[in-house]
Amino acid sequence: MDLNLREAIMHNVANNTKEQLEHTIEDAIQRGEEKYLPGLGVLFEAIWTHANEQQKDMMLTTLEQAVKQ
């Protein structure tokens, strides 16, 4: 069986609303379990690949501040 994790995760959220996506992200973060990290990574990858340079710069600034805390 050839399991493509990225495809599976994207398939599972393909028809989700903005609110459902937010709930998925918030729930994964609140649970704090490492098993959710790949899914969050795939979602971040989707955000990153669809962001323009200004949006990427804003994300990087936010990330830089967050990791310094």
Curated annotation (Swiss-Prot):
The keyword Transmembrane helix does not apply. This is Small, acid-soluble spore protein I. It comes from Geobacillus kaustophilus (strain HTA426). It is found in: Spore core. HAMAP family: SspI. One of its GO terms (biological process) is asexual sporulation. Its main location: other. Pfam families: SSPI. Keywords: Sporulation. Belongs to the SspI family. It comes from the Bacteria. Induction: Expressed only in the forespore compartment of sporulating cells.
